[in-house]
Amino acid sequence: GDVYKRQGEFMFKQFTMELAGRTLRVDIGRVCAQANGAALMHYGDTVVLSTATASKEPREGIDFFPLSVEYEEKMYAVGKIPGGFNKREGKASENAILTSRVIDRPMRPLFPKDYRNDVTLNNMVMSVDTECRPELLAMLGSAIATCISDIPFDGPCATTQIGLIDGEFVVNPSQTQWQEGDLQLTVASTRQKVIMIEAGANEIPEAKMIEAIYKCHDVNQTVIAFINKIREEVGKPKHAYTSCAIPEEMFAAMREIVTPEQMEEAVFTDEKQQREENIREITDKFAEAFAENEEWLAVLDEAVYQYQKKTVRKMILKDHKRPDGRAIDQIR
């Protein structure tokens, strides 16, 4: 990337690529130096600032990964300042919430399963050009900011949108083309595979839809190569973190107390109350056995759930039977 300096001192690095006939420009190190990762994204005249931040320590007492994604649309991005009595901007619009979800969905599974540090991905729309949709830029910006940060992340991933105008595909369409075309398709991919598809369409042939998905996936590969280039030049080494995974020796001890066969017996009933009662009895049995071990007791419920999940998965995939006795191809 090009290095920009002021009075001989490093200011920021700039990377560019051609994407769907327009220039995608990424400035790294220009703003938000205190964030774990930040990218100032330019596409046409649309500008979005994407940042990725993570807490130093894992959050206590939770059994999920605390990721929050924010997409902020500001009135000044389209050159308007709210007038009158109320100068503040209201709560996030429906479009902003849906965009946050589309950013979250492909990225969440790429963080480590045992990571419990709070992570916030913030996308602020600074300026809007109706030819280049800011939503797409935020999706790419979040991926770049996270990839170059020191937050553990199994990326990169990239997102492409496709519209269909008069039977022709338009990659990364303008706002008008997006709203008026016959297809609104958003596809996120890693290098190996497609990881998310979001679509709305008038009726179009299945073959056309499949072609569009492949086309998005191909475009994503060029963007991923670009992100990898950025990461090689400015990426930080990933930080070590405290794993919140359930220890393997705990599972081994659980299998000694309640064998997989006994667990199968406990879940193999079509009475939900009965199944819950069986699991409660098993949990009590474990609680008694691990009474001395406070660390294990703290994660007992999650461990029992995972043991139950593995058992049901094995029953379905290997033995072709479901917990309520139905065959795998049988409908209620």
Task: Annotate each language-model stretch with its function.
Residues 1-4:
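Short, small-residue-biased leader/transition segments that mark boundaries at the very start
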